[in-house]
């Protein structure tokens, strides 16, 4: 299957949450998510108990490789751009990957309305947009309110991981994450990654440009 074989499920003016062709669509500027989110869970996750999630999945190379590596874990790929969702979907279909689900929408909307408490065993954010200009920083993913959502969604002892090429973004994210999660690494709580992180398109892009890759992990402590 080619990416363009995945058709949009609705026109913008008719937007609504739906599951179609293995993709959960959670549109922005829609105000009745709660009416759908109570019923989708069984259809989409089918009683899987070991669940991991990647945010900012891009073209899907990394998450597809993870799903192939461990078929006992259900992976969720969250990506807001439909052109990229199409590419993830095409890889999922062509490789016949049964343990991968795709969410087309923002991470914030998906977590607020569709992710239950203590649901995830692992959450990975790969190369999120750092929004480097000061006036744009309100658009960053790892805002304090979303870090709280992350903590809520993780099981006790679950791991959160972040990979980025932007050191300023890394350090500010570490500060935000410490309000709800505990670092797994010693000070300064991150490492520089010299080896390939896992065939991410963005990782390959930044390495070809000579960028350093930074990686950090946090853990959800019991009772938080």
UniProtKB/Swiss-Prot annotation:
Originating organism: Chlamydia pneumoniae (Chlamydophila pneumoniae)
Residues holding substrate: 133, 165
Any one GO cellular component localisation term in the record: tRNA methyltransferase complex
Keyword tRNA processing: yes
Catalytic EC class: transferase
Enzyme Commission number(s) from the entry: 2.1.1.33
Reactions that this protein is recorded to catalyse: guanosine(46) in tRNA + S-adenosyl-L-methionine = N(7)-methylguanosine(46) in tRNA + S-adenosyl-L-homocysteine
Single GO term (MF): tRNA (guanine(46)-N7)-methyltransferase activity
Its biological purpose: Catalyzes the formation of N(7)-methylguanine at position 46 (m7G46) in tRNA.
One Pfam short name: Methyltransf_4
Protein family (similarity comment): Belongs to the class I-like SAM-binding methyltransferase superfamily. TrmB family.
Catalytic residues identified in the record: 129
Keywords: Methyltransferase, S-adenosyl-L-methionine, Transferase, tRNA processing
Pathway the protein contributes to: tRNA modification; N(7)-methylguanine-tRNA biosynthesis
Protein name: tRNA (guanine-N(7)-)-methyltransferase
């Amino acid at each position: 299957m080619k990416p363009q074989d995945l058709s949009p499920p609705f026109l913008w003016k008719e937007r609504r949450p739906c599951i179609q062709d293995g993709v959960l669509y959670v549109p922005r500027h829609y105000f009745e998510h709660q009416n759908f989110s109570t019923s989708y869970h069984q259809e989409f996750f089918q009683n899987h108990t070991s669940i991991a999630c990647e945010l900012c999945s891009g073209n899907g190379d990394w998450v597809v490789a993870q799903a192939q590596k461990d078929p006992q874990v259900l992976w969720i790929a969250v990506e807001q751009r439909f052109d990229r969702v199409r590419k993830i979907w095409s890889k999922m279909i062509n490789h016949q990957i049964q343990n991968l689900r795709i969410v087309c929408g923002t991470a914030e909307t998906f977590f607020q309305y569709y992710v239950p408490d203590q649901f995830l065993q692992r959450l990975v954010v790969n190369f999120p947009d750092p929004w480097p200009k000061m006036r744009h920083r309100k658009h960053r993913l790892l805002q304090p309110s979303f870090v709280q959502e992350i903590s809520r969604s993780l099981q006790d002892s679950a791991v959160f991981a972040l990979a980025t090429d932007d050191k300023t973004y890394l350090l500010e994210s570490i500060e935000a994450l410490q309000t709800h999660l505990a670092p797994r690494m010693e000070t300064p709580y991150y490492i520089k990654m010299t080896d390939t992180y896992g065939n991410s398109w963005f990782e390959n892009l930044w390495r070809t440009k000579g960028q350093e890759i930074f990686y950090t992990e946090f853990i959800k402590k019991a009772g938080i």
